[in-house]
């Protein structure tokens, strides 16, 4: 079965797994999904991630993070979709929850947080908001 929006599928899998307190979530891997997982790990929203399986069909394993029995990720929302891409210039990059959350942005220099994009002086496609 073909998935029309693999990034939205990734975010939904994470959201659903955390709703039922799963320790690990599995999904088909891609370069963009790995880059998003790297940002989530660097920002402390997930414990770790790794790619397993054969080269033809790699599987991304994400170890979810909980604090006092509650998921660390309170909200994770898709912003830019395949049918409606949302691009922001370097001066228009949004702040999520007044700086308490992050926006994950795909820039020409790679996938990064809103803070790093502002510091680097680049804009790009706003993939999702995480809080």
Curated annotation (Swiss-Prot):
Keywords: Ribonucleoprotein, Ribosomal protein, RNA-binding, rRNA-binding. InterPro entries: Ribosomal_uS8, Ribosomal_uS8_CS, Ribosomal_uS8_sf. GO terms for cellular component: ribonucleoprotein complex; ribosome. It holds the Pfam family Ribosomal_S8. The keyword Glycoprotein does not apply. SUPFAM superfamilies: Ribosomal protein S8. The keyword Ribosomal protein applies. One of its GO terms (biological process) is translation. One of its GO terms (molecular function) is structural constituent of ribosome. PANTHER family: 40S RIBOSOMAL PROTEIN S15A (PTHR11758). Part of the 30S ribosomal subunit. Contacts proteins S5 and S12. One of the primary rRNA binding proteins, it binds directly to 16S rRNA central domain where it helps coordinate assembly of the platform of the 30S subunit. Belongs to the universal ribosomal protein uS8 family. This is Small ribosomal subunit protein uS8. It comes from Polynucleobacter asymbioticus (strain DSM 18221 / CIP 109841 / QLW-P1DMWA-1). The lineage of its organism: Bacteria, Pseudomonadati, Pseudomonadota, Betaproteobacteria, Burkholderiales. The gene is rpsH.
